[in-house]
Amino acid sequence: MSKPPPKPAKPGQVKVYRALFTFDPRTPDELYFEEGDILYISDTSDSNWWKGTCRGRTGLIPSNYVAEQAESIDNPMHEAAKRGNLSWLRECLDNKVGINGLDKAGNTSLYWACHGGHKDVVEILLSQPNCELNQQNKLGDTPLHAAAWKGYSDIVEMLLNKNARTDVVNNEKKTALDMATNAQCASLLKRKLGGVILRTHSNAEEYLDDEDSD
């Protein structure tokens, strides 16, 4: 008895699979791929033939092949970010894989890149216009919490330069500064927090001055 076909992808949502066997096309429209190749399925509107991309080539793949002879990769961007795999990350971005997707623990790919100290991956993710900097996972931690806890001061600085929030507290009521494990991270976070406090104080004084002048 064959497995039921996978649920169709939502419009605009790319589903990613790893091929378990080589597929030999019978027509020019069909996509050739080998065992172990990554398949990016972008269009599942036809129940029999899905549109996919592999190694930069686009073509049709029988949906029953995907159901029976391919392994779903639920969070490819997260896997690439965890491993610091730049080429896979770029491939995910080229194939429109969602950048802010959450895994089961509520982590984004940016969180895993920060957690792993993969500066080059962090740089690419931060260059994307819709990258969510302050997403909290199920423990309440943000990418900034992860970088501070792991002691990656260069990544902390990159996040702060993109205006990551320093006032977010996790489930244990800790900010990124509370979790900083080295002096360099703590210093960067204190400086940023100091700037925020100074600006807030300055704004408050301006407000009071306005009140007095009324």
Curated annotation (Swiss-Prot):
GO terms under cellular component: cytoplasm
ANK repeat extents: 72-101, 105-135, 139-168
SH3 domain: residues covered: 12-71
InterPro entries in the record: Ankyrin_rpt, Ankyrin_rpt-contain_sf, SH3-like_dom_sf, SH3_domain
Keywords of the record: ANK repeat, Cytoplasm, Repeat, SH3 domain
Listed Gene3D superfamilies: Ankyrin repeat-containing domain, SH3 Domains
Localization terms from the record: Cytoplasm
PROSITE patterns to which the protein is assigned, alphabetical: ANK_REP_REGION, ANK_REPEAT, SH3
BP GO terms, sorted: signal transduction
SMART domains in the cross-refs: ANK (SM00248), SH3 (SM00326)
Role played: Induces bone resorption, acting probably through a signaling cascade which results in the secretion of factor(s) enhancing osteoclast formation and activity.
Name this polypeptide is given: Osteoclast-stimulating factor 1
Protein's organism: Danio rerio (Zebrafish)
